Amino acid sequence: MAEGRMLKRAIATSKKMAELETDSARLLYTWFIPFLDVEGRFYGDPDVIKGSIVPRIKDFTAEKVKECLADMQRVGLILWYLVNDDKYLQFTVFEKHQNINRDRESKLVFPAPEDSCVTPED
């Protein structure tokens, strides 16, 4: 994984970002970006996300993370999915907004989505 990623100005005028119900979901989405692998994927377990992305923000509980993920999936910013009973997520427009140099990136860390999406009740 890269140490950092680009955050382009287009995020400010994104209709999908505007459709998110909370600023918490917007913040979490942007803070995810440097943690994504070369394909725009990361763990989808709310507890892991809490511990990795927002470990020091007490207001961000695992339940709040789960609500934010459901909202991101609802507007089409992420695909939240299962592989072998483990949750992962895929940012849907990652390649459009990142200039990836695959020769310098580490190998894929997270499995590709199959046909199973996660719902907030899962």
Enumerate the predicted regions with their spans.
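Generic detector of isolated residues embedded in canonical secondary-structure elements
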Residues: 27-28, 48, 71, 90
